[in-house]
């Protein structure tokens, strides 16, 4: 057994946090959701549309990562908790895909962007292996978990937004806070808390940031409605979005802090803040008992002990450079695919 996670108690369980898979009954009507559903602002709406698509792809990858970790966890309670995380992520992707169909009906290049995002994640595994993928997922969960906490702390962000989308994002934020420690604890069981494990976490965060600074902005740029394309070059057009994400009360400021704290050898997300008060405040407002789903843990621990962590060295720098080059080439192809798709639509 590793890292003080006992056979019966996980850090989430110690705090009374139960990770519950849920399937909400949200419906998204393409005829009632306006194109500019986020306060009528094109830049902000487009950013959240791209985040929905990119997030859905990421969650599919997190599901695979969680399953990969479960195969290496010889602890039933921790394996169950990780499986609950996996189920939540799968349902998140499923619900967001319902909204994505509205975006497809609006003529946005959703499927092309999904394929692009999926390929970027695949490059990480092809070049650097699944432990690196899991480190990227770990960093992603810490970023998204803190993002969710900030949303729950500032619900006024969604004032004047379409109600179905407000419900979607607030429910999603709640569950991200609820399971924020789950992937971390599974990852730590498998990889440990050595100096090399810490370095792997940090490099995973570097991969995540390097990916996000290209993949999300290019998604925002290409998801703009045709009628607003000419406005994209004006800095003032982006000011509301920049203020929302990075201003004095920006939604991403806490996420940056969490990623920075991954440098700590003994990092744990619960050291950043106590999630109990905000979960207790929002649980009855954002979830319903009839949404809850149960499952049986089928198998776990069959590959325990097969993960060996090497020290980060020059070969890892080379892999990162190869990854960045692959991302740039795939981004060029993505832009070409979007242009071709829009030209075909225009000719139709």
Question: How would you label these PLM feature ranges?
Answer:
Residues 2-346:
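Non-heme di-metal
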